[in-house]
Curated annotation (Swiss-Prot):
The sphingofungins A, B, C, and D, show a limited antifungal spectrum of activity but are especially effective against Cryptococcus species, fungal pathogens causing opportunistic infections in human. One of its GO terms (cellular component) is nucleus. GO terms for biological process: DNA-templated transcription. It comes from Aspergillus fumigatus (strain CBS 144.89 / FGSC A1163 / CEA10) (Neosartorya fumigata). CDD domains: fungal_TF_MHR, GAL4. Residues 91-106 have a biased composition (Low complexity). It comes from the Eukaryota. This is Transcription factor sphG. Disruption phenotype: Completely abolishes the production of sphingofungins.
């Protein structure tokens, strides 16, 4: 006969056993009961307590507590009334005739609403974390780190965690989330080589694509002024070239090539696995210019003096870091750009009218609006407060997008950013006071009205976009931004009884659906081309809501399918991104949840897993590498993820040289003998090779001239050598 356990010997309380959750086994009250305000009971028999009895006791206990609370509030109200009534009754001898008494405040029933009927809503809180090194970090509520920690907490409450396989996968997922949160630490760097001036041939080839596809989204320079800057660099001696101008030229090339890379990715995704190549000239070029951008970061102290070109260099570096490097570095670069812009009065651009040319004034105006919008994006993604208040920026009420060189979508985006700032100041800021239901409802209604007016003025029909497959990519972006702001508005007040605040999961699903549609849409004036930049600027609440719904068992099969499609899309656009970049971390977080979902499905299909191997063959194969101390993008000792052969060729160090490579034959079966013959082969290849519609004759000429440039800077290798010709020919074949 089994030994009967006494109350003191029984290891699980009745409440935790009834809820099927892990008990901390602390007596007289475990942690779960203490957190939920329940009376921790120990039956001593090891049996599951009766659910009806437990529910009855819970309801009676809550009723008793509510009755005590109402009584205490009523007594407090009476005491306060007596206090105010007593203070208003002043004896005649105590009154001062020179200053008549002001009417005493009278308390009405409206001053003390029933606390049971009127809930109080406070601002959402962030997360405070102390790591193993005792480093303290604070994350805002909308930051990716804070949302990842929320998902980590939710994993243990997800269904089927009592099963061994699912439990192991959940524990592994929590470790992976801890690793993701710890990524992106800035490490001080020592002296490094300054950035090198990129080849002028490539620069000239990229100016027109940038101002055609990317400038409307990030109006950092005017085309006229940038062309003048590039011409001045070409005519000046290497020792006299300005560092900020070099950084601007390098980043323009990088942004233009990055904007075209999603199209290259989609072309590769349409190819079979047998014919798909793992490398392309796009990515090899990007990694070379990205290395040059990292060198600019290492010399950031030379870019903080008050000059307009320094502001432009810092803003372009921020955009590059937003996509390729860590969130922390991106935020730091924008903060430096904002401080430098304020010091030269960029936001008071109207004050320069009459003193500067119209082109210079318009350039400052566009840069001011661009900074304001980027500041609001970082406010949500990094969880920090805005650095540029609307009071510091001059918004022209007569602004017409088609006039004065103003991009068409800039006005709508700036107005949307102003609404985002209002949402932050009224809901997320530190000074926000608690509000009741009516106050929360009234503010939300006012913001929704402003958002609708903003869409109407830009000609965007949200209902039509949601119900049909039509709509331009630019309208899709505005609709996604609209849904994102709506989610920021209602997400902190999920427990509000108004139906509007219960729509967060539906809004998040629609936002994810439109994002996937934008990804698959054809290029539309560059809107699809800058998809990576756009995705990195969105707060990740949409993904958080979808992941939470799936983990809690409320997600549908369509949600899981969209998540899988989202993972594939992120994998496509983050192949050459740093592990700590924003989009790459979105990809890794989505993979973690996908692993947990797959483990659940596998467990349900095979309740008795065999011991021959792991039950789930899909356990984050890309995240199973040994954990590191964090991504150190500024550490000179860290191995950078780029093709060293290309970096040694384009941005040649003094002691660098081309690595030996195998030869590649021409179309005739023989190696090209000279540079002229090789250049003609490049041009003919650009015209005949399939899928090379983006590499026109100008681009081919730029690549050919770059061979001559590399020959001049590479001192130890000839441009006619087989290694140089083979490298370029191989990359062209990989397009």
């Amino acid at each position: 006969m089994a030994k009967e356990l006494s109350r003191d010997e029984y290891t699980v309380c009745d409440q935790c056993r009834a809820r099927k959750i892990r008990c901390s086994r602390e007596k007289p009250s475990c942690r779960n009961c203490g957190r939920l305000g329940l009376q921790c009971e120990w039956s001593g028999q090891g049996k599951k307590c009766n659910q009806t009895t437990l529910l009855s006791h819970t309801i009676l206990g809550m009723g008793s507590r509510l009755e005590q609370l109402e009584t205490a509030l009523a007594d407090t109200q009476k005491s306060l009334k007596r206090l105010f009534d007593g203070s208003s009754t002043i004896s005649p001898s105590a009154r001062c005739p020179a200053s008549p008494a002001s009417p005493s405040p009278r308390l009405s029933d409206k001053r003390f609403p029933d606390s049971i009927q009127s809930a109080v809503f406070t601002r959402p809180l962030g997360r405070f974390l102390v790591d193993q090194d005792r480093d303290e970090r604070c994350f805002g509520p909308t930051s990716l780190e804070s949302l990842m920690l929320n998902i980590k907490d939710e994993l243990l409450q997800s269904p089927d965690t009592d099963r061994h396989t699912v439990k192991e996968c959940v524990l592994q997922a929590q470790r992976k989330i801890d690793h993701l949160v710890g990524q992106g630490e800035e490490i001080p760097i020592g002296g490094k080589a300054p950035p090198t001036m990129p080849p002028f041939a490539i620069l000239e080839a990229m100016i027109e694509p940038y101002f055609t596809t990317t400038h409307g989204h990030f109006p950092i320079w005017s085309k006229k002024r940038f062309t003048e800057m590039a011409t001045a660099l070409r005519q000046s001696a290497p020792s006299e070239r300005d560092l900020a101008s070099i950084v601007c030229c390098n980043n323009l090339i990088l942004m233009a090539m990055s904007a075209d890379s999603p199209g290259s990715h989609q072309r590769e995704s349409m190819m079979s696995k047998q014919t798909r190549k793992t490398s392309s000239i796009d990515f090899d070029l990007i990694t070379g210019f990205l290395t040059n951008a990292k060198r600019a970061v290492s010399n950031i102290d030379q870019l903080v003096s008050p000059h307009l070109v320094n502001v432009q260099a810092l803003v372009s570096l921020h955009i590059v870091a937003q996509v390729y490097l860590s969130i922390g570095l991106s935020e730091t670069l924008l903060a430096l750009a904002i401080r430098c812009a304020k010091s030269i009065g960029v936001h008071q651009w109207h004050a320069f009218q009459g003193r500067l040319s119209d082109d210079d004034v318009n350039e400052r105006q566009n840069l001011s609006y661009c900074l304001y919008m980027l500041d609001k994006a970082v406010c949500w993604t990094a969880g920090s407060s805005p650095s540029i208040p609307v009071s510091d920026v001059h918004f022209d009420p007569r602004l017409v997008p088609s006039e004065n060189g103003i991009p068409s979508s800039l006005v709508a985006k700036a107005e949307m950013a102003r609404i985002e700032e209002t949402v932050y100041l009224e809901i997320y800021a530190v000074h926000v006071q608690a509000r009741d239901e009516n106050q929360v409802r009234g503010f939300a209604a006012a913001i929704m009205s402003k958002l609708q007016v903003c869409l109407t003025e830009t000609g965007v029909d949200l209902d039509q976009i949601q119900t049909s497959l039509d709509g331009s990519a630019s309208n899709l972006q505005l609709a996604i931004r609209y849904l994102s702001v709506q989610l920021l508005l209602i997400w902190p007040h999920k427990h509000h009884p108004d139906p509007m605040f219960q729509q967060a999961p539906e809004v998040a699903r629609m936002c994810l659906k439109l994002l996937l549609r934008l990804w698959h849409s054809p290029p539309d004036q560059g809107s699809q081309a800058v998809f990576s930049f756009f995705l990195a600027s969105l707060p990740s609440l949409y993904l958080y809501e979808v992941l939470i719904s799936i983990l809690c068992g409320r997600g549908t099969n369509r949600d899981i399918d969209m998540l899988q499609e989202f993972v594939e899309m992120l994998q496509t656009i983050t192949d050459c991104r740093a592990e700590a970049s924003y989009n790459r971390r979105l990809y890794q977080l989505s993979l973690i949840v996908t692993d947990v979902v797959k483990a659940r499905r596998t467990q349900h299909k095979r309740p008795k897993p065999t011991s021959e191997g792991p039950t789930d063959p899909y356990l984050m194969s890309e995240l199973l590498s040994p954990a590191t101390t964090g991504y150190s993008y500024m550490n000179s000792e860290v191995q950078e993820t780029y093709d060293s052969r290309f970096d040694g060729g384009v941005f040649q160090d003094p002691d660098g040289s081309f690595a030996p490579m195998s030869s590649i034959t021409s179309t005739s079966g023989e190696l090209a003998r000279g540079s002229d013959e090789f250049l003609s082969q490049l041009r003919s290849y650009g015209k005949s090779a399939p899928g090379n519609e983006h590499f026109d004759s100008l681009a081919m000429e730029a690549l050919g001239e770059s061979v001559l440039f590399w020959k001049g800077v590479n001192q130890g290798a000839s441009a006619d050598s087989p290694s140089v010709r083979c490298d370029l020919g191989e990359r062209l074949n990989y397009i």
